[in-house]
Amino acid sequence: GVALSDAGIFVHDAAAALGRKILGLRDAALTDEAVEALMDSTVSELMERQVGTALLEDGRGRWMARRMSAACRLAAQRFARQLRQGSFRPAGFEIGFGSGKQFPHSERGGIALSGFVDRVDVFRNGDCDYLRVIDYKTGNKKPDLAGAKDGYQVQLWVYLIALCAGWPHVTGRTARPAGAYYFIVQDDYVDDAGKGVEANRAEAGRLVGLTCDDPRVLRATDRDLV
């Protein structure tokens, strides 16, 4: 069988794989239908490679497979919506920091940074690239600004700083920080505080984090904000 924690990992991996497939697609191709079709093919590939046919041999396994597929389709819809509502576009997925990775020049303050960020988006404005980092989550963890000020829960912000510092070495372009976010990709819509299932779905589809207060960045993040 597949545990719920394994299902979360599956949805996370499917969302990342979908992102790699749509790199370079024109905006007109980012319809819900087109992105869902790409996700369906991604789910089929991952299901065969990671889970296998044994999952479908009993009722619970078939239920779990349906749930994972539904969660993946919702993640695909949300991803497409994030791109359509603004001007940021994916620059890469599972971007690595440290020796032998995409951003090897990741030493900050004498400390060598090593790790990965799930997704990097870029908004190109003249000769400057505005960057945002996005961490895919299957739980309900949210960035904690107070915690960041106190020196904990700073992982996303450290990656963003290192990304902007290393960007000119990799791309030859100047970079500025635009934001750091969690993207909740789970399928868990318990009615929270009476808001209702649909309200929770809409809320879960948002990028949850902090955005630079530059009007250009706000407009590029969501055209309805400014």
Located regions from the model:
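Structural signature of nuclease core domains in nucleic-acid processing machines
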Residues: 1-226
